């Protein structure tokens, strides 16, 4: 059965139910997904507090991870998707609650805004030796105003895009 780690960006919060429904339909055809939620507007609130100097890097990191958990509950709510705290390959559609797993082992991740939910998804896909799909409201990666479908992680290093710098460091020489 094909298995994918799917990072579902917070920018898609308005389409969450339709997207989860589509994933559940695909799971009936033996596709399996571990959905990694973005932080969405909840993480934006954390970033706003951080930008005002009200939070340390450490507190902001863990609060942003908890924001991902809030989005996970929204994604699973009424859709039939199952919430999980386990980082593992499994059948169907599971939505990860990442806090506990990352508290146990977040090796490779700095506690800074360079490492967001994108980095969490890359880290988990690497641990599971899985393909990673990053779903956002942008169809590709925007570099200097141009949408590119495929780029190397090396090209992205140091460029501000819709992919965080931590992900780029974790990807190293892979193609994304």
What label would you give each PLM region?
Residues 47-67:
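A charged helix-plus-loop insertion that forms the helical arch/lid used to bind
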Residues 65-89:
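Ordered, amphipathic secondary-structure segments that act as subunit-interaction surfaces
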Residues 51-52, 86, 91-124, 129-176:
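Active-site phosphate/oxyanion-binding loops
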Residues 12-14, 41-44, 102-103, 139-142:
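Short, active-site-adjacent cap segments at secondary-structure transitions
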Residues 1-34:
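N-terminal glycine-/serine-/threonine-rich phosphate-binding loop
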